Amino acid sequence: MIEVVDGATDDAAVARIYSDVMRWSTTTPERVHYFRGAMPTLRDWLARVDGEAVGAARCVELPDMKESEAASADICVLPAARQRGVGTLLFEHTSTHARSLGKTELEVFAYEDDADGVAFAERRGFRCIMRMRSLRLVLEGLEAPSIELPDGVSLTTLAERPDLGHQMWEVACEAIPDIPIDSDMPMRPGTFEEFHSLHLAGPRFISEATFLALHGDDVIGYGQLEWQDRAGGIAVHEMLAVRRAFRGRGVAGAIKAAQISWALETGLDELRTGNEERNVAARAVNARYPYQPTPDGLLFRGPIASDTHDAE
């Protein structure tokens, strides 16, 4: 028997399922709990088969989706429990919640080597709207890169200058909409309060690894490392953004070098990142280092399930 309960029933089980299915984007119970509290529109569920937790899902209107026809969803089922209707039932729950938010579509993520996950989306009429070229940088034996700053540019961190968080958000407001995506709305960081709760607080946030590029007193770029697996020594490049007027001058390269140097000094084992395949400039910065490819991340978009019954 398949039973679907509120995700808050067991954060540890939800985190384990997400991590097992996503593999390259692991999470923790603390992050699951924090994200739920930070996102007022979020609903999540845990699926059990004969009492065993085998699936997890969530649906939320992210800050950049307020004017979009889509909501964001994660639907994860452990491989051994697939082809038994668990994913379909979770899809119905996410669709019902998306409909309550006034949405007609969902955006879901899968890695390209998860054939079942990709097929699940494609069978339901979902199309790929973004392909992330995913990479990992193993730090063992890597020499610290030199940090070459353009004239008039200096680096600091949010740990040293916590007063610069609002300027960092202003850079995000300019840079994030430039990320290529085949969607009805460009990507956006949301309000400062939303940006702060998602990127400047919580268990993933590392203030001393949030680098800010300054031109005089003005923030012109930033780059964040966030924890992927703190116990395992793995951090992820969450975002690297530069104001349009300062692009092509080496600002992004200096921030990337500072991030890698910090990771080496801190004793991390690995950094992970991903860039939309059309983001040529960002991929060129990564090409300077021995990043190794991992399975591409695919963002799909498609229609919610038909309104056959109330899955809530």
PLM features: residue spans?
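Oxyanion-binding "anion nests"
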Residues: P180, H196, G202-F205, F211
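Glycine-rich acetyl-CoA-binding "A-motif" of GNAT/NAT acetyltransferases
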Residues: E52-G55, D116, I129, S207, ...
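Short amphipathic alpha-helix that is part of the acyltransferase structural core
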Residues: M1-Y34, L46-R48, A53, E148-G190, ...
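Acyl-donor-binding surface of acyltransferase catalytic domains
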Residues: E52, P79-R161, L298-G302
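Conserved donor-binding loop and adjoining core beta-sheet/short helix segment
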Residues: A8-D11, A15-E112, H215, I220-R243
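Short loop/turn motifs at secondary-structure junctions and domain boundaries
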Residues: F35-M39, A201-I206
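Active-site/acyl-donor-binding loops of N-acyltransferases
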Residues: R124-E143, A209, S261, T266-E312
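Conserved acetyl-CoA-binding loop-helix of GNAT-fold acetyltransferases
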Residues: Q83-T96, R123, V242, G248-S261, ...
